[in-house]
Amino acid sequence: MDTLLAPTETARRDYVRAMAAQHRAGGPLQREFYTSPDIFQEDMRRIWGRYWLYAGHTCQIPRTGDWLTYEVGSDSVIVVRGEKGEIRAFHNTCRHRGSRVCPAETGNSRRLVCPYHSWTYGLDGQLMMDTKGDFGVDRSELSLHPVKVRAVAGLIFISLSDNPVDFEDGFATIARKLAPHGLERAKVAHQIDYVVKANWKLVFENNRECYHCPPNHREYNTATYDVHRDNGNFDPKLKAEMEQIVAEANARFRSLGLDEGDAQSTMTGAHWRCHRTPLMKGFTTQSLDGRPVAPLMGDFKERDAGTLRMTVFPNFWQHANDDYACASRLTAIGPAETHVRVLWFVDREAIEGRDYTLDRLLPLWKLTSEQDWDICQWNQQGVSSSRYVPGRYSLTREQNVAHFVDWYLSEVTK
């Protein structure tokens, strides 16, 4: 049965559709899509409320009773490691009077105990106290509300919808391509939280192209060959060199038993993508000098496995090398504000100071990320101007941004 929308929700939906009708294909969105509180509410309902969202990595909750919470809009979700090692997720709201059950961000508990009146739940979400006599209802009717959750190759995805957007092909591809990296046997070496003063779509649009990389990402440019392609530099000699690098790298990936193909969803705009690419000649990992920064991870026995790039709309991207991985989790918190958590992962047996140091592990992606946040904030300031008029995307260097916008408009207007 269709959900009955309140009058304000109906008006918001109609407003979004009217604004979408003004969009000119091949160009950026209208200003209101980056600034309007009403459109932001529709984003949260139609996109963030329906899609699978990256919540964390399984290695963040390795032991029975370990849990983390993830805030999305007005919702909070508990992700917990169950008695048999399974990953479960629940709405973080007590079935008594609605208090947060787990007010902290992480913890370990044999039971989930609400701090308000000590209502106690098992790690399976079942209420453990008798309520029939005092409350007139059987405790089986008062379990924590479950949340859809999938753990795939060390990644945890949750969905706030009872009927989330289909992601089965994505889960299967991620499981196959990411498995050699052994992220379920990793640990968080470091994390940094940022509040980026920009709409979440601008942050993701920036991630979808490297046209901006040559003037902004000196460190990233030294490690990544396809920056030159995205910058429109099609010098025949460079093109031939890149094609040779790719051919040699793919042969090496196959010899290592790695799936080197490019895989993405077949939906409009492709809401997920997963592909392995080579690094610049002389680079075995994404570091400032190309040299390893940590011990090999997962199943790798030798170095130079390129980098496995993953993107999942609306809130996740990750680069996984053979010695470390760096993941970014976006959370939309307002029309012009996005929380971004950047996490670095290494093998769980690696010891800081002996096997890796943060001054070598962090710089490339810390610098690149912070450069991006500046760009996104300047972009937000510009599109907020009364004089902003959407321009045009490059046909050869920003096609992925156009695909993202197509995907977004298709989903937010449904």
What are the residue ranges of the model-derived segments?
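Rieske [2Fe-2S] iron-sulfur-binding domain
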Residues: 60-180
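Short clusters of hydrophobic/aromatic residues that line enzyme substrate/ligand-binding pockets
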Residues: 55, 101, 127, 388, ...
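N-terminal pre-ligand scaffold of iron-sulfur
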Residues: 1-104, 148-152
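C-terminal catalytic domain of Rieske-type non-heme iron oxygenases
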Residues: 150, 155-414
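Short Pro/Gly-enriched beta-strand edge/turn motifs at strand-loop
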Residues: 49-61, 129-133, 310-314
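N-terminal short leaders/motifs
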Residues: 9-37, 98-112, 143-153, 257-295
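Short hydrophobic core segments
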Residues: 43, 93-94, 113, 203, ...
